[in-house]
């Protein structure tokens, strides 16, 4: 069998733009810099903004209900 066919799997430091950092293992050489992590992402922090999809659905139904009524008249 060949020797040294697999890359080295070493510990690396991941640094976020918010200042958070953590250690993980990777074949990447050197530190990894990311723009967003689980400490600052709105989904994980619970500060995400929910969209009003119910209002959009009602507006869609009203729009096409009018179109159906006009089509029935013709």
Curated annotation (Swiss-Prot):
> Record's GO cellular component, any one?
ribonucleoprotein complex
Where is Zn(2+) bound in this sequence? 16, 18, 37, 40
Q: Which residues form the signal peptide?
A: none
Top-rank taxon: Bacteria
GO terms, molecular function: metal ion binding; rRNA binding; structural constituent of ribosome
Task: Provide the cofactor list for this protein.
Answer: Zn(2+)
Q: Which UniProt keywords apply?
A: Metal-binding, Ribonucleoprotein, Ribosomal protein, RNA-binding, rRNA-binding, Zinc
**Which SUPFAM superfamilies is this protein grouped with?**
L28p-like
Per UniProt, the cofactor note for this protein states: Binds 1 zinc ion per subunit.
Q: Does the keyword Ribonucleoprotein apply?
A: yes
Q: Which Pfam families does the annotation name? A: Ribosomal_L31
Q: Report the record's Gene Ontology biological process terms.
A: translation
Q: Name the job this protein performs.
A: Binds the 23S rRNA.
What is known about its subunit structure?
Part of the 50S ribosomal subunit.
State the family named in the UniProt similarity comment for this chain: Belongs to the bacterial ribosomal protein bL31 family. Type A subfamily.
NCBIfam families to which the protein is assigned, alphabetical:
L31, PRK00019.1
HAMAP family xref list: Ribosomal_bL31_1 (MF_00501)
Name of the molecule in the record: Large ribosomal subunit protein bL31
> Species name for this entry?
Koribacter versatilis (strain Ellin345)
């Amino acid at each position: 069998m060949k020797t040294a066919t697999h890359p080295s799997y070493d510990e690396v430091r991941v640094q976020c733009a918010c200042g958070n950092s953590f250690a993980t293992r990777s074949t990447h050489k050197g530190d990894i810099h990311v723009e967003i992590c689980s400490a600052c992402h709105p989904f994980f922090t619970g500060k995400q903004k929910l969209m009003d999809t119910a209002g959009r659905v009602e507006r869609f139904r009203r729009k096409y209900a009018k179109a159906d009524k006009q089509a029935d008249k013709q």
